[in-house]
Amino acid sequence: MIFNNTKENDYKIYLRGDLVMKKLMTGNEAIARGAYEAGVKYASAYPGTPSTEILENIALYKDDIVAEWAPNEKVALESAAGGAFAGARTLASMKHVGLNVAADPLFTVAYTGINGGFVVITADEPGMHSSQNEQDNRNYAKSAKVPLLEPSTSQEAKDMMKMAYEISENFNTLVIMRLTTRLCHSKGLVECEDRNEVGIKPYEKVVKRVTVPANARLLRVDVEEREKKLYKFSNETEVNYMEINEGAKVGVISSGMCFNFAKEVFNNNASYLKLGFTNPMPDEKIKEFASKVEKIYIVEENDKFIEEHVKS
């Protein structure tokens, strides 16, 4: 492997003789790049550390994406949801406490489904570097019964953005992408690809999106059926994977940035179950991993989200 820095943040990397262009990006920059490559048409956000730079970087792709600051997080989510209903790929971005403000439309859109792909990005704050609390927004995904993705690196952040839109459209649901401060602001090499120009889907008037009680009761059945399909996907997806080290008796289950922390501490002295898709949890994969080790440690920040599920 040979590195050749051509200009600031741009690297030519020769892997086995092949030239690969990579950029040094923060997690927030990588999220913006992933949105661009996924064919996102509209993005709305309310600023707040550690999420602010996401929309700032999306705005750099102004020829392809309409980027707007919203007066609050609820408006950001509703604006992006409207774009998704109209058939475009959209996103809404906010810090963790902002999802409290946006909770009303979040739970309703979880029932109605979407048309174009829709991703909601929440940037959580373990350690409260610039926040008033340490709430864990993984709980929102579980309560709303929507898919949850947790990248561990800038490269994963970019790649999972593209994956999130496929999940959103295939399962007719919004997707929550959960970041944390250390991922948002740390840097890593990211391989950039061309934009996938996804067309706007035709709009059709769908009466069920008017969530009066008569419709909402029927939609609840759809939500439960969708969760069964997502559970199957969780056990099959490649972002939930095992790293088995021969002779290791200890197993570590982790997600997000904590996976990097765990690997730095345990190195090859443990085997790992790395969870990138954490709602619904991959029960079958967890059981398989548990059968391969004698003791399990769960490494996560804030709430005992993974731990409580594994114990249950």
Regions found by a protein language model. Give the residues of each.
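Flexible, low-complexity linker and terminal segments
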Residues: 3-7, 11-28, 151-312
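Thiamine diphosphate
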Residues: 13-154, 182, 245-246, 269-272, ...
